[in-house]
Amino acid sequence: MQLDIIAVGQMRGAGEMPLVEEFHQRIEASGRQLGISGLSIIELREKRALTGGDKKRSENALIADALARRSGPLIVLDETGTSLTSRAFADKLQGWIERGDSDVTFVIGGADGLDDAIRGRADLVLSFGPMTWPHMLARVLLCEQLWRAISILTRHPYHRD
């Protein structure tokens, strides 16, 4: 199973980048035990020249285009979504693995968020709590939680209850 993250914006050596790279390596190394073939991060260009609704529509069109080539479960990150414990998230991942899904796609929108059409396609709208997170930090949180879920499923000592 392939894990894909589609995210608006590009990491440019920011402080978050080393964290994403570290969790990416851990996911790829330990995920093999579970049948996870890898993690891809697809960065979509942020539309800085546009504002408001035009920016959101343009970025969401890029996301929709990227999703056209995906067939597995779609999980979008949105502050209005469902909050899960790390164990519940690991259970979701286990379910996708057991079901034999070939890929699972996570979407992180830009600063103006996701439109209803993208959220409506989601199998799960996931929230990291009611607070608003910068999309670059949301990427770190998602990578960490993917690694944590894998560590729970492989009984690695990283996660402690």
Segments the model singles out, each with a brief description of its role:
Residues 17, 21-25, 60-61, 116-119:
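Short, surface-exposed alpha-helical segments at coil->helix boundaries
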Residues 17-20, 86-90, 119, 139:
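Conserved strand-to-helix beginnings and helix N-cap segments that scaffold or border functional pockets
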Residues 1-31:
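N-terminal beta1-alpha1 ligand-phosphate binding loop
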Residues 36-104:
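S-adenosyl-L-methionine/SAH cofactor-binding core of RNA-modifying enzymes
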Residues 11, 79-82, 110-113:
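Short glycine-rich anion-binding loops that position phosphate/pyrophosphate groups of nucleotides
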Residues 6, 42, 75, 124-126:
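Hydrophobic/aromatic beta-strand patches that form the interior of the parallel beta-sheet core
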Residues 112, 116-161:
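Structured adenosyl-cofactor binding patch, chiefly the S-adenosyl-L-methionine
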